[in-house]
Amino acid sequence: MAKQNTVLIKLVSSADTGFFYVKKKNPRKTTEKLEFKKYDPVARKHVVFKEAKMK
């Protein structure tokens, strides 16, 4: 079997609410850290989510 290309990463809220999204990423194609502006239901507004490693 071939090695899996995608890895799971965690997108952590910059509002420090503890809320996160889980997303797949191909580390060979996108080497830089991901950053998205998404909705944080705890803060109840759109904030920047930054990539962190899954434990």
Swiss-Prot record:
Keywords for this protein: Ribonucleoprotein, Ribosomal protein
GO biological process: translation
GO cellular component, one term: cytoplasm
Pfam families hit by this protein: Ribosomal_L33 (PF00471)
InterPro entries attached to this UniProt entry: Ribosomal_bL33 (IPR001705), Ribosomal_bL33_CS (IPR018264), Ribosomal_bL33_sf (IPR038584), Ribosomal_zn-bd (IPR011332)
Disulfide bond entries: none
Superkingdom of origin organism: Bacteria
GO molecular function: structural constituent of ribosome
Gene3D superfamilies recorded: Ribosomal protein L33 (2.20.28.120)
PANTHER family: 54S RIBOSOMAL PROTEIN L39, MITOCHONDRIAL (PTHR15238), LARGE RIBOSOMAL SUBUNIT PROTEIN BL33M (PTHR15238:SF1)
Family: Belongs to the bacterial ribosomal protein bL33 family.
Protein name as annotated: Large ribosomal subunit protein bL33
Origin species: Rhodospirillum centenum (strain ATCC 51521 / SW)
Gene name of this polypeptide: rpmG
